[in-house]
């Protein structure tokens, strides 16, 4: 999957997959992570693992890559469908969350850095 000149490979960093395959693999992987009670405890009061933040960061980093791909490769089609307000609103809220809690490194945001800066501008 690509976002401009940036290429995202699956899992081990060597497996190149198409964007639809990447998204499907990602959604399945995220579901597996969320269903794992060792990572996301289901019972109230159960402690989260010490590396919980690492799991969350990894999930959100990979989701950012999907946004980057959509903006680079599909935004004109999104505009044609008159769906840009919905996409922009979802991305804006995502960015506010990951920025507030520093969950995605700035280096990861480079493929759509100008858009990120514009959206986060006070």
Curated annotation (Swiss-Prot):
Which Pfam families did the record assign?
A: Mob1_phocein
Q: Where is Zn(2+) annotated to bind?
A: 69, 74
Q: Mostly located where?
A: nucleus
Localization annotation: Nucleus; Cytoplasm, Cytoskeleton, Phragmoplast
InterPro entries assigned: MOB_kinase_act_fam (IPR005301), MOB_kinase_act_sf (IPR036703)
Q: What is the protein name given in its UniProt record?
A: Putative MOB kinase activator-like 2B
Q: Which GO terms describe its cellular component?
A: cytoskeleton; nucleus; phragmoplast
Tell me the organism: Arabidopsis thaliana (Mouse-ear cress)
| Recorded family membership | Belongs to the MOB1/phocein family.
This protein's UniProt keywords: Cytoplasm, Cytoskeleton, Metal-binding, Nucleus, Zinc
What's one GO MF term for it? Answer: metal ion binding
